[in-house]
């Protein structure tokens, strides 16, 4: 026995060497296949891995993803993998005889599926012990072949190839089993393998044990028909021969006849084929929602409430959410009924007299009602199955409520006086009869949006019987407001575009609200219906009766709300029709849609389309009972625009017929002339010099009246639609849907906002183009302006920045020749002054201000020639920089330390990355509120208020009172919060000094301090580039350039955010440069013996970081440094 493992090892090595030589010779072209073949021949496990990598799955007939294998290994570690690698089901080399099973073409073909009468599965398991014996036999045969070749000098490879043929039946053990059969397989390595045959719906599987029970490893499908088929959701209902063979006595599955379809004809295709309108939009959505509700409430095997009887007494109801809740509430409902019977019995015993018969009847009816609508009534008392029950919610309540939503709304939708989009007389199948409502809605929306223009022009004109003598072959249903787009596009006026699109956008908004409201009502009815076992038993007792009443009231409210919305839509459509089309009546014709046949490759389509067109048969008294109705239609704006050739032909025909048919002499002259309409239409109006055609003015008047009526209707409907959800809820005493459904004006407002944005962008582009042209014109005079400026000279004042933060203010003066520069300087100064917050001061302060101001003359040769184009460009950059200065909040913080002003914080915060129109609008509102706060604060401080401690004996003016009132409103509303913390280092000293001085001296100190502050703010608000250019001529400062550039016309949130970041970066550069210069740094040549303070070191560190990051670039080759 000790030599037995060694013999096995030697046999395996010889097998490996011989197999390598043989396989390499046979499969020399593919080395990878050779290696895999050798490895797959060693053990059953390696052979299973090789089959998994190179061929289709041999362990199963149903393909599964590799992720499934990983999950199953976690559920059943070791057992699943060992069974998985040894199991064989899909192997044509094995299953071709009586021992393993004879399956021509393979066990997994459609013809060889399992018979439901005899659900037996054939499979095999690989055995390592038999594999070793088979390999040893191959080694022995190979040795004999080699010996024979040595003795006979023949080629041994044919014999060796025959010896090493893969004889799978030698090392596989066949098994057969029906659902429930199990057993064990014993082998070398992992000694025991447990297997069990199970049935999973239409599959028979070989399983093994796992943590969750039986884990299927390999499966095979069963033939049709059989109960609980997974194919029943996509079997064609009309293909009865496929479902049931007349020669086969096997009963067909009732669920296989269900008209559901998840593959061939889904909910979308079913609704699309049943629809009769040209443009299908909403009916597929409603059909899919109805199928989802049926699957949720009844069973996942059905998709319509018409198929309820097919799942009675079947376990497929277990998948129903309502059924599961009913089973859970069974004992609770039984307890309620028991208490009700007990209380009724106590009432009989304690009453002392026999109650009337009506009370007995009421008692019995209540028990039946509660049982029927909560948990269902058992059909067969002898059968205790929980599936065999009559359920009132499934069989009566839900069909009534869900179909009632569409039925009531359909009655109103088809009540249009003009006959447009009436689908109630068209035949629909019983299961899809509700589509008539949504076809009417789609037809209306398509008609008012002009989506059916091509269908009317190409299809309708071909099929309906035209009177071509009236030249009506060029008729199309283009909405009248579409014609406003023509002048709007030509002129670029966005106001006309908004007017032209306002009504169709409102139609889309209200239609979207109707669809959304109907879906939300259906879902709400489903939710309330599932809770029926909880609320229906409350009907038994007076104490809980209110809960049941509220439940029923909500159900009825959700039933009626869509009808209210449809009534509003029909009113809006009717007023629109009358305003544009007068009393025109529509006719319809059901045609076959040959266009779809051509699109589908010539296949015959079952879909027919109902086309509506204006009835131009003026002799049809059923629709035009009097002459006024005919004239109203002919003179309407819509008819004239939709039938231009017909209108011109009718006008010419009427006039020519009167001329031709009339004979002079038969009537008086006045009667004869009255027949000529074109002559009676030419009259001399009062106040007119020329003869005016009266008929033309009549047409224009009718057109204007139609437009005014349409605009007035649009205004009324727009304002009423904002309260449509609340109105529908109040009418039905229910819950408003405006919080859970899209609002009726949502799409309208979003589209109008988009049009407004587009109009603003268009206007901005036009202004930019006009500005660019002006700049180019000014640039043409560059030589003249440069010479003029150079010859005239100017005196320029510089702002000199001194170390330690001190600055000497200067006043800029210019000569007459530099008037352009002077005007620009004044403009910038005025813009800066408007942002600075300072209290009022007496006029005497100007003498002190002038005393510290001085002019610095500058030689003419130091001024560079400047063109008007450069001046305009610099002016724009200056204004842009001024707009990017810090907010008033920051300026007041710096000023409050010196003036004792209270501080405040702005509490509203903008969205960092606004998404959608709503957040962008909120950001705009917050920015407007910030501007309002700044204005209120400036007015408060300018009026003498806003200090931590008020001055004594100071009169309160009306301006101050109003400013305080406005500021108090902002504080009370929570927009701002006052901060009255004081700066003890400066403010207390200032207050102490102010208390010691008299009133006149105190006012002068305040004025001097405010002037100093004005000069400081004025210096800090100028561009850093300008300050450097002015001061480097005096102090030898280095120059720099700001490298970031904003988008000229930012498009989208991303570019707007980038511009904001660049502006923030520019402010950071300004602060860093000012701090560097004020600390004594930033010079081209350092002064000897100057000590570098900590402030300067920090400033230089910040500035170096900005230079290294590429935000700014230093320029140290400035020629003006010679003057330092």
Swiss-Prot record:
InterPro entries: Conjugal_tfr_TrbL/VirB6 (IPR007688). Keywords: Cell membrane, Membrane, Signal, Transmembrane, Transmembrane helix. The chain crosses the membrane at residues 332-352, 359-379, 393-413, 495-515, 522-542, 555-575, 700-720. Residues 1-28 form the signal peptide. Disulfide bonds: none annotated. It is found in: Cell membrane. The keyword Zinc does not apply. GO terms for cellular component: plasma membrane. Belongs to the TrbL/VirB6 family. GO terms for biological process: protein secretion by the type IV secretion system. It holds the Pfam family TrbL. The keyword Kinase does not apply. This is Uncharacterized protein RP104. It comes from Rickettsia prowazekii (strain Madrid E). It is a multi-pass membrane protein.
């Amino acid at each position: 026995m000790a030599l037995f493992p060694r013999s096995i090892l030697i046999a395996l090595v010889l097998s490996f060497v011989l197999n390598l030589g043989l396989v390499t010779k046979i499969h020399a072209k593919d080395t990878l296949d050779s290696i895999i073949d050798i490895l797959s021949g060693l053990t059953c496990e390696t052979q299973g891995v090789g089959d998994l990598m190179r061929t289709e799955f041999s362990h199963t007939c149903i393909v599964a993803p590799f992720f499934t294998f990983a999950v199953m290994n976690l559920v059943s570690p070791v057992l699943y993998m060992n069974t998985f690698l040894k199991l064989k089901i899909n192997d044509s080399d094995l299953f071709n005889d009586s021992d393993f099973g004879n399956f021509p073409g393979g066990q997994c073909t459609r013809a060889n599926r399992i018979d439901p009468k005899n659900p037996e599965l054939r499979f095999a398991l690989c055995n390592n012990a038999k594999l070793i014996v088979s390999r040893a036999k191959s080694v022995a045969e190979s040795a004999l072949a080699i010996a024979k070749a040595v003795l006979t000098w023949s080629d041994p490879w044919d014999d060796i190839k025959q010896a090493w043929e893969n004889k799978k039946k030698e090392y596989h053990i066949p098994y057969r089993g029906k659902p429930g059969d199990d057993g064990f397989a014993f082998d070398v390595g992992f000694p025991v393998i447990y297997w069990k045959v199970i049935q999973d719906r239409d599959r028979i599987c070989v399983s093994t044990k796992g943590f969750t029970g039986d884990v299927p490893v390999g499966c095979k499908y069963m033939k049709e028909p059989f109960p609980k088929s997974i194919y029943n959701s996509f079997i064609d209902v009309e293909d009865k021969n496929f479902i049931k063979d007349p020669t086969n006595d096997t009963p067909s599955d009732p669920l296989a006849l269900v008209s559901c379809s998840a593959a061939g004809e889904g909910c979308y295709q079913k609704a699309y084929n049943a629809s009769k309108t040209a443009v299908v939009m909403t009916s597929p959505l409603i059909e899919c929602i109805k199928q989802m509700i049926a699957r949720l409430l009844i069973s996942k095997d059905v998709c319509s409430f018409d198929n309820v009887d097919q799942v009675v007494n079947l376990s497929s109801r277990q998948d129903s959410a309502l059924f599961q809740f009913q089973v859970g509430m069974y004992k609770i409902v039984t307890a309620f009924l028991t208490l009700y019977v007990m209380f009724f019995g106590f009432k009989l015993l304690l009453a002392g007299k026999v109650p009337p018969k009506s009370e007995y009847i009421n008692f019995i009816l209540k028990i039946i009602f509660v049982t029927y609508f909560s948990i269902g009534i058992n059909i067969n008392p002898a059968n205790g199955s929980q599936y065999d029950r009559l359920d009132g919610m499934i069989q009566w309540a839900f069909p009534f409520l869900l179909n009632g939503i569409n039925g009531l709304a359909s009655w109103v939708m088809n009540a249009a006086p003009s006959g447009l989009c009436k689908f109630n007389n068209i035949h629909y199948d019983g299961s899809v009869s509700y589509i008539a409502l949504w076809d009417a809605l789609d037809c209306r929306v398509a008609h008012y949006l002009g989506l059916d223009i091509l269908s009317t022009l190409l299809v309708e004109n071909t099929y309906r019987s035209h009177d071509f003598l009236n030249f009506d072959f060029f008729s199309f249903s283009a909405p009248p407001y579409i014609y406003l787009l023509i002048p709007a596009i030509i002129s670029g006026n966005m106001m006309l575009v908004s007017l032209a699109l306002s009504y169709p956008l409102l139609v889309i908004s209200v239609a979207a609200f109707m669809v959304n409201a109907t879906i939300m009502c259906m879902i709400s009815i489903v939710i309330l219906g599932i809770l029926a076992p909880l609320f229906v038993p409350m009907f038994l007792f007076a104490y809980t009766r209110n809960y049941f009443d509220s439940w029923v009231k909500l159900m009825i409210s959700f039933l009626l709300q869509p009808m209210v919305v449809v009534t509003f839509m029909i009113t809006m459509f009717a007023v629109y029709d009358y305003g544009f089309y007068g009393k025109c009546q529509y006719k319809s014709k059901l045609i076959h849609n040959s266009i779809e046949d051509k699109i589908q490759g010539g296949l015959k389509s079952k879909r027919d389309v109902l086309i509506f067109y204006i009835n131009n048969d003026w002799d049809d008294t059923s629709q035009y009972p009097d002459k006024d109705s005919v004239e109203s239609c002919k003179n309407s704006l819509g008819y004239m625009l939709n039938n231009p050739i017909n209108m011109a032909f009718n006008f010419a025909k009427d006039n020519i017929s009167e001329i031709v048919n009339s004979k002079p002499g038969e009537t008086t002259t006045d009667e004869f002339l009255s027949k000529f309409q074109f002559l009676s239409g030419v009259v001399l109006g009062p106040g007119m010099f020329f003869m005016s055609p009266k008929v033309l003015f009549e047409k224009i008047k009718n057109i204007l009246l139609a437009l005014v009526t349409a605009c007035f209707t649009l205004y009324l409907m727009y304002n009423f639609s904002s309260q449509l959800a609340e109105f529908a809820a109040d009418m039905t005493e229910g819950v408003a849907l405006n919080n859970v459904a899209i609002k009726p004006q949502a799409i309208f407002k979003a589209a109008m906002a988009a049009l407004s944005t587009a109009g603003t962008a268009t206007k901005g582009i036009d202004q930019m183009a006009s500005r660019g042209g002006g700049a180019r014109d000014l640039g043409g005079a560059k030589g003249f302006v440069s010479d003029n400026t150079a010859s005239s000279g100017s005196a320029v004042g510089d702002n000199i920045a001194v170390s330690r933060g001190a600055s000497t203010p200067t006043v800029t003066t210019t000569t007459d020749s530099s008037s352009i520069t002077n005007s620009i300087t004044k403009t910038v100064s005025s813009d800066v002054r408007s942002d600075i917050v300072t209290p009022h001061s007496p006029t005497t302060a100007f003498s002190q201000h002038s005393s510290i101001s001085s002019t610095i003359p500058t030689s003419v040769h130091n001024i560079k020639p400047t063109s008007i184009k450069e001046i305009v460009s610099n002016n724009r950059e200056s204004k842009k920089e001024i707009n990017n200065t810090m907010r008033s909040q920051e300026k007041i913080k710096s000023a409050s330390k010196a003036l004792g002003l209270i501080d405040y914080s702005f509490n509203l915060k903008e969205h960092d990355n606004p998404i959608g129109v709503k957040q962008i609008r909120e950001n705009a509102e917050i920015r407007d509120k910030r501007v309002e706060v700044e204005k209120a604060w400036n007015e408060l401080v300018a009026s003498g208020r806003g200090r931590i401690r008020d001055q004594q004996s100071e009169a309160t003016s009306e301006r101050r009172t109003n400013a305080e009132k406005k500021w108090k409103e902002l504080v009370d509303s929570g927009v701002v919060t006052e901060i009255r913390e004081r700066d003890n280092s400066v403010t207390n000293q200032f207050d102490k000094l102010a208390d010691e001085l008299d009133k006149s001296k105190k006012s002068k100190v305040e004025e001097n301090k405010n002037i100093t502050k004005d000069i400081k703010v004025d210096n800090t608000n100028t561009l850093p580039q300008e300050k450097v250019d002015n001061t480097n001529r005096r102090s030898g400062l280095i120059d720099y350039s700001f490298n970031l550039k904003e988008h000229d016309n930012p498009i989208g949130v991303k570019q707007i955010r980038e511009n904001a970041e660049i502006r923030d970066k520019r402010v950071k550069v300004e602060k860093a440069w000012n701090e560097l210069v004020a600390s004594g740094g930033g010079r081209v040549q350092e002064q000897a013996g100057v000590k570098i303070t900590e402030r300067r070191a920090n400033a230089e560190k910040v500035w170096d970081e900005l230079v290294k990051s590429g935000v700014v670039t230093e320029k140290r080759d400035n020629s003006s440094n010679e003057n330092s």
